[in-house]
Amino acid sequence: MEISQAEWVRDTFIDHRYAQGYFLMGAGDRLEWYTSRQRALIPLDERFRYPASLRRVLNQNRFQVAINRDFSAVVEGCADRPMTWITPRLKEVYHLLYATGWAVSFETWQGDELAGGILGIVIGGAFIGESMFYRIPNGSKVAMVKLVEHLRQRGFLLFDAQLQNPHLERFGAYVVSPRKYRQLLAQAIRKPCQFL
């Protein structure tokens, strides 16, 4: 019995990998699944914070927010750096996940210019952040704040940032053990949430 592309994608990438706490990275021509000993999460409660300088930018309303307005440009923006794990093969996977309703881009714009964005996978009430980028200063930071607002409004339970770094710490990102992460992920993916 043949299965549809959507069923194959769900079985191959979602149910047996992302929903189990793994994430993809490209390594040359190969795609490899990873997990981490300490999983970074962006808080969706009062622990979320951002610098005062960003508050001024937000108050100026310099950026407009869009979802999936230019998914391909966000993938390219995330991959456009000297050392990238978003290989051509992984780009194909992201486009396949987008075509089947799992991958999304949360974007900031200035007029007709893409300012920044966040690439993610949505499963139930979990948003798994894959990468982010900016072309205009503060573009990705504003995207982060607006994405957290969006996830809160939609009742999401989890914003997974995968790996901790100093940039994410400025937004209140914290780490949890693999066991705690799997518990939070299992709870989140069971909650039916609409991202769009």
Swiss-Prot record:
Cellular compartment(s): Cytoplasm
What GO molecular functions are on record for this protein? leucyl-tRNA--protein transferase activity
Give the record's GO CC terms: cytoplasm
Q: What is its EC number?
A: 2.3.2.6
The biological processes this protein is annotated with in GO are:
protein catabolic process
> What keywords are assigned to this protein?
Acyltransferase, Cytoplasm, Transferase
Q: Which HAMAP family match?
A: Leu_Phe_trans (MF_00688)
Explain the purpose of this protein.
Functions in the N-end rule pathway of protein degradation where it conjugates Leu, Phe and, less efficiently, Met from aminoacyl-tRNAs to the N-termini of proteins containing an N-terminal arginine or lysine.
Which family does the UniProt entry place this protein in?
Belongs to the L/F-transferase family.
Listed name of the protein = Leucyl/phenylalanyl-tRNA--protein transferase
Gene name tied to this protein = aat
